[in-house]
Structures are given as C-alpha cells and as structure tokens.
A protein has these predicted regions:
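Bacterial N-terminal signal peptides
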Residues: 8-17
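N-terminal leader/linker segments that initiate helical-solenoid repeat arrays
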Residues: 21-62, 121, 322, 326-330, ...
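Terminal, low-structured helical/coil segments at or just beyond the last alpha-helical repeat
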Residues: 29, 318-326, 330, 489-520
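Short helix-capping/linker turns of helical repeat alpha-solenoids
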Residues: 50-53, 66-68, 73, 86-90, ...
Length: 520
C-alpha cells in the first residue's frame, strides 16, 4: 500500500514520535541480539495495547500506519488509534483526525477531522498547532488554515490572537472561501482599513453572500475605501434588502425617508423600514416617524413603532415631545396615559378630542375606545360605534379593528353581523394592525367564520410576529405550523430553534413602558 505525497508530507509532521515506552523496552532488552530485541519490543507493545494501554495503542497505530515493524494497514492503524482515543489519549485523537482529513483507512471527512483535531488540542496535544502552522507556511493548506484560524479565534490550545486569525482568514479568503472573505472584510472595516475591506466585500458579494452585498453597497454609498457612487451603492443595498437583511432594509428605508441619493418616497421608506423594524431599533424609530409625519398621519402605528424604539432613543423622544409642531402626538400620548394607566376616561377623551381637532383620526378612534371601555361609568357603546365609523371615514385602520369586534359581539349594534365583522377585521389586518392579524390568523387556524387555512393563518402570524405582537394563542398555533413543516414558513430548517423561541415568546409591552416613562 503506497502513501501519496501529501500524506508523506503530513506524516513527517503529524505522527507522534516513538513513545518513551518503546525506547525503554529496547533498552531493557539491550543485552539480547538486536533482531530478537526488536521483535520482543514489538511484542511487548502489542501485548500492552491488547491489555488496553492507550499509549501502546497509539504507538501500534503509528507502526501500522507507517509500515514499521508490521505490514502497513491504514484501517488497522485507525482501529488502534480509535481505541487509544476512546481513553482520551490526545495523540490517538490527533492521529485519528489525520486519517479523516486524508481519507486513509476511512472515508474522507473534513468536518470530523476538524472536530477531532480540536479535541486533541484541548486534551493536551501541543504539537498539532505548530505542525499545521508549518504546513500552511509550506503549502498554503486551506484545511490547516481553517483549523488555525478557529484555534486562535477561540483560544483553543493557544491564547486568542486576532492578528493571527486575520492571517489565516486571508489564506482562506485568497482560496475563494466566501465566509473568510466576508469575515476578513469585516475585520478590516472595524479597524478602519476600508480599502481592503471593500476589496474582500466585493469578492464575497460576487458569490451572492447577502451581507457582503449590503456592505459593498454601504461602502459605495458612503465613499469608504472606494470612489463614492450613491446610485450603485443604493442598488446593491436594495438587492440585499430584498433578501431580508434588516440592516440593508434600514439603510434603504432611511435613504428614501431622507431623500439621500434618491428622490424622497415615504411609501417606499415605510415598506423597507417596516420589514426591518421588528429587529432593528433604528428602523423602528424611523418607521414611527414615517407614520407620524406622513401626508396622512397614522398615530396608532407611529406610537407603536416609536415605543418599540424608545430604549436607546430617549433623547429623540424628549426632543419630539418638546417640538411645538408635534402637539398632536404629545396630546395623543397624554391621552393614552390617562386611558391605560390612570383609567381617567373623561380626561382621556378631552385629550383625544384635541388630537381630532389637530387632524388625527386616531383621536376619534380612542374617544370611541374610551367610551366603550367596560370600566367607564359613562359607557356608551352606541356612541362608540358611531365614532368608530367616523374615524374609519377619516382613515383610521385601527378603528376597523375595534369596530369589527363590536359587529362580532353585537355591542352597540341592533344585531350581530359576523360578515361585516370579518370584512373589517381583514381591512385592519391588511392595514398593518398586528392584533387584527393575530385574530384573523386564529380564525383561519380554527376555521371560524372562514374556511380553515393553516397556510393563511401562518402568514398572518408571521406578520404579527414581525411587529413583536404575537398573542399567546397565535404563538401556540404557529408552533403547530412549525411542527408540521408548513412550506409557507421561511425558516423550516431552523424549526426546532423557532419552536423553542415561540414557547418562551412574550409580546411587546413597549407602549406601556413608554407611557410610564413620560413625565407629567
């Protein structure tokens, strides 16, 4: 059995030296003839190996691998190394790793080889790292570079050393490894080496890595490390945004909101910011401003997203509330505080009337909600229905959600009207009201008032979850969808992780937190 050249190169570095046990055996038999001494020492090693001596098992594996003292046999070598490794012998584990790396005695498996090398290093095999450093220096081995990169990055057998990490990242990056190209580019960007960062982001972007596409666009848009080109930069960031990358969605939304490098377009800004807002505080903040300052203000959604972004934007909120041009928003929040925290419905209605006069349809919606509240001593559901209808005419989508509940129960109505209730619920869900999406999803899930449709239910639940407002029943039903692998779900590959997240899911309470933080 012949060994290939790469195996010979590796063996010269990786195999453990003859054990001290063998040297001692030879010494002990030094008075006997040389041939007999060698034969006896081999038999002693075999005997010890058969009795379970891990060092002897490793040594016997070395002999079978190299053909020294025995007939060469990779598979038998691996069997002995496996026995040694089972007893946590670091040399045996390291030699097993070599077999998996080269495919000698077993099917080649780089992942298993990498795992075994790291295990051997952790258990004290100090020779592996310098051996692989020499291999990289001599041949530029991609496998060895990856092993060393991981070791220096995570402190496996060595102290963490980010400079060395970058050295081995570059070896991998030059070989065409897209993840290494991206990681190296990010490292360069963080250390203000924008030109080199741009080079490697571009290489990774060519291979379709969405994060690299985003960063390449970001650098072009801002002229970092490359000549500034806002149009091309925005096009690349948009490409990444369409691949559901929140950072890209935020930057594209911001550009449209501010008219930076492109014509100002609030509708497009809302689209991109809305896709990112559930995961990106800056996107949530800007989305709130879009709803607040749009041609037709939507105070319901503006408040929802501004409250989501409140932590980290305290100064921005204080500045917003101090702005005399934002009196409508100020009064709306003050009214919500009276409604939710103080249960002072009379004071709340007064503030919501002020909001109405300033052009906010949600002021009418919240007047109705205050009048319909079960704790309001002056409760008037008929008047509430009338106000909800008026609010809808003024453009309040939230009013459709509240009014649908009244049609469903018949409160304030002459009779129950489930058909109209469903119509209004759909209107609210399509308008971005998360709790309407939850409720409509529950209906599709249960087949209540609509034909049962798990796919439609899952779509609605995902929309509500993106706003951090999934109800407990919706979360439970979404778990059911993941357990059964419905294709509409975008991340089925991570179904187990998603199920665990959903089991612990708690809807956002950001609005109440914001209201509690407001000064009188």
């Amino acid at each position: 059995m012949k060994m290939n050249l790469s195996a010979i190169l590796f063996l010269s570095l990786a195999l453990s030296p003859l054990s001290s046990m063998e040297a001692a055996s030879v010494t002990n038999l030094s008075l006997a003839p040389k041939v007999k001494a060698k034969k006896d020492s081999v038999e002693i090693v075999k005997e010890k190996a058969n009795k379970g001596d891990a060092v002897a098992q490793n040594q016997l594996g070395v002999w079978y691998y190299t053909g020294k003292n025995v007939k060469q046999d990779y598979k038998v070598a691996l069997d002995w190394w496996a026995k040694s490794a089972k007893q946590n012998n670091p040399d045996g584990i390291g030699n097993m790793a070599m077999c998996y790396q080269l495919g000698n005695g077993i099917k080649k498996d780089s992942v298993m080889a990498m795992t075994l090398y790291k295990s051997a290093i952790k258990k004290g095999n100090a020779s592996i790292i310098p051996q692989h450093e020499k291999i990289v220096k001599n041949s530029g081995s991609v496998f060895s570079a990856r092993l060393l990169m991981d070791c220096y990055q995570n402190g496996i057998g060595v102290k963490r050393d980010l400079k060395k990490v970058e050295i081995y990242q570059e070896v991998l990056a030059k070989s065409g490894d897209v993840d290494a190209q991206f990681a190296l580019a990010l490292s360069c960007l963080n250390s203000k080496r924008s030109e080199k960062a741009a080079k490697y982001f571009a290489l990774a972007a060519k291979k379709g890595k969405k994060e690299a596409i985003y960063y390449q666009g970001f650098l072009l848009f801002n002229g970092m490390g490359v000549e500034q080109d806002k149009a091309k930069g925005l096009a690349l960031m948009t490409q990444a945004a369409e691949k559901n990358l929140p950072a890209a969605q935020y930057q594209v939304g911001r550009a449209y909101y501010e008219g930076d490098g492109v014509a100002k377009d609030i509708a497009k800004a809302q689209r991109y910011l809305g896709a990112a807002a559930g995961k990106n505080k800056n996107a949530a903040w800007m989305l709130g401003l879009c709803y607040l300052n749009g041609q037709t203000p939507n105070l319901y959604l503006a408040t929802q997203w501004i409250s989501e972004a409140a932590k980290g934007h305290e100064k921005d909120i204080n500045a917003l509330l101090a702005d005399s041009k934002q009196k409508m928003f100020y009064d709306y929040l003050a009214g919500l505080k009276k409604f939710y925290l103080d249960k002072d419905f009379e004071a709340a209605i007064k503030l919501f009337k002020s909001v109405e006069k300033l052009g906010g349809a949600e002021g009418i919606t919240m007047q109705a909600t205050s009048m319909a509240h079960k704790d309001n001593k002056k409760r008037n559901t008929k008047k509430a229905v009338s106000l909800y209808q008026k609010a809808m005419e003024k453009g309040s989508v939230a009013a459709a959600y509240y009014l649908s509940s009244m049609y469903e129960t018949g409160e304030g109505m002459k009779t129950v009207n489930k058909e109209q209730a469903l119509k209004l619920l759909k209107k609210a869900a399509n308008g971005g009201i998360a709790y309407a999406q939850d409720k409509l999803g529950d209906k599709y899930f249960a087949g209540e008032d609509v034909a049962r449709d798990y796919t439609e239910a899952a779509k609605l639940y995902l929309q509500a979850e993106a706003q951090n407002r999934l109800t407990s029943s919706a979360a439970k039903n979404l778990i059911y969808c993941y357990e059964r692998g419905f294709k509409v779900l975008p991340d089925l590959a991570n179904a187990k992780q998603r199920i665990e997240v959903l089991k612990k899911y708690k809807p956002s309470n950001s609005l109440i937190d914001l209201l509690k933080s407001l000064e009188e």
